[in-house]
A protein has these predicted regions:
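Conserved catalytic scaffold of divalent metal-dependent phosphoesterases
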Residues: 58-148
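Generic beta-sheet signal
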Residues: 48-50, 92, 134, 168, ...
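Generic alpha-helical propensity signal that fires on short helical segments
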Residues: 34, 61-65, 100, 107, ...
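Small-side-chain structural scaffolding
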Residues: 14, 19, 23, 90-94, ...
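Core catalytic region of metal-dependent phosphoesterases/phosphodiesterases
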Residues: 1-84, 147-160, 186, 190-193
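Binuclear metal-dependent phosphoesterase catalytic core
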Residues: 4, 105-106, 112, 119, ...
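Receiver (REC) domain switch-region micro-motif
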Residues: 16, 131-133, 165
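Active-site environment of divalent metal-dependent phosphoester hydrolases
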Residues: 23-27, 51-59, 81-83, 96-100, ...
Length: 203
């Protein structure tokens, strides 16, 4: 797509959800140029943590960073939620569900964050609106589908009647591992930049 097309498609009042991996910076202060780059693009950007976002820190520190640098259109999705066009936007980083060594602890932690985000949305915006979930890591894999099993993330999405989940993380040859389509009532979609040919996807 490229930046000219982004500028052409996105209006100032639009929201663009970016599900992780924005900067190679190790610390928040080192990511200033990347944040300025995002801030200078049209539209409001909602950032979700990716596995390479080592600069990510507490929500208070990140919000202060945004305020101090006078970035006007960057927000974070982290244990919270947003209401956009009468839809509740929730999400979390997730975890590699094939990582058996750290699987239980990290998946439980990230699943708890997903539930915090969902309950925040329900509390603030009511239970009469569609909830759309975003994650960085895939919430399910092909083995789960073949074995007719549910991951903790899928169970949480099902519990709160969420029917759409978008995720990233998979690039290049890993695209073949993506699970897309309707699985047990939930529509999954891979939205990694290279998978979308660096184009935007209208949610």
């Amino acid at each position: 797509m490229g930046i000219p097309a982004f500028i052409k498609q996105v209006k100032e009042e639009d929201y663009v959800i970016l599900p992780g991996d924005f900067s190679w910076a190790m610390y928040l202060d080192d990511a200033r140029l990347d944040f300025k780059y995002l801030n200078d693009l049209p539209g409001n950007k909602i950032l979700l943590k990716g596995n390479h976002d080592y600069w990510w820190t507490t929500i208070a520190k990140m919000n202060n960073f945004i305020k101090e640098n006078e970035y006007k259109n960057i927000y974070f999705l982290y244990n919270n939620s947003y209401l956009i066009e009468n839809k509740i936007i929730v999400g979390t980083r997730g975890w590699n569900i094939l990582d058996t060594e750290n699987n239980s602890k990290m998946i439980k932690r990230e699943n708890a964050r997903l539930e915090l985000s969902i309950t925040d949305g329900l509390k603030r915006f009511g239970n009469d609106k569609e909830i759309i979930a975003f994650m960085h890591y895939p919430p399910i894999n092909k083995n789960d589908v073949i074995g007719n099993e549910q991951t903790e993330f899928a169970k949480t999405l099902k519990k709160y009647n969420i029917h759409r989940c978008y995720y990233g993380h998979l690039h290049g040859p890993s695209h073949k591992d993506a699970v897309e389509g309707n699985i047990d009532g939930i529509e999954y979609k891979l939205i990694s930049a290279d998978y979308l040919n660096f184009d935007l996807l209208n949610i």
